[in-house]
């Protein structure tokens, strides 16, 4: 499923993949803005977080959208205290189909992309 994430994310205008981990961002006002990244799971207390390739963190527009997703299906979407107050949800990749994944990644990109890029992209659809 990570190959699907990569294919979808990199098909979006201006999207790039981080060199050091599985994460995608878009340049906005001179800074890379992340829209999808591998979940860094806290497996053991007092130890560094480790990548969990089965879970993707996805940026959402706001807390309301986050709550809607979290309440929609807890088999697919969840959160953890690290993400409290931050507009992102955690997605179990095995629980969603490619169509849902494409919608989630595209919406996440729309949250972070500069307005001109969003308008061009939406105008072409």
Regions found by a protein language model. Name each.
Residues 1-125:
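Charge-dense, helix-prone N-terminal extensions
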């Amino acid at each position: 499923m990570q190959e699907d994430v990569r294919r979808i994310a990199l098909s979006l205008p201006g999207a790039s993949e981080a060199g050091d981990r599985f994460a995608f961002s878009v340049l906005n006002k001179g800074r890379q803005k992340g829209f999808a990244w591998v979940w860094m799971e806290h497996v053991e207390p007092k130890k560094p977080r480790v990548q969990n390739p089965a879970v993707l963190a996805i940026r959402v527009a706001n807390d309301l959208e986050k709550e809607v997703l979290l309440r929609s299906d807890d088999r697919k979407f969840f959160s953890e205290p690290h993400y409290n107050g931050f507009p992102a949800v955690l997605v179990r990749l095995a629980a969603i189909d490619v169509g849902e994944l494409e919608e989630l990644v595209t919406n996440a990109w729309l949250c972070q992309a500069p307005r001109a890029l969003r308008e061009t992209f939406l105008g072409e659809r």
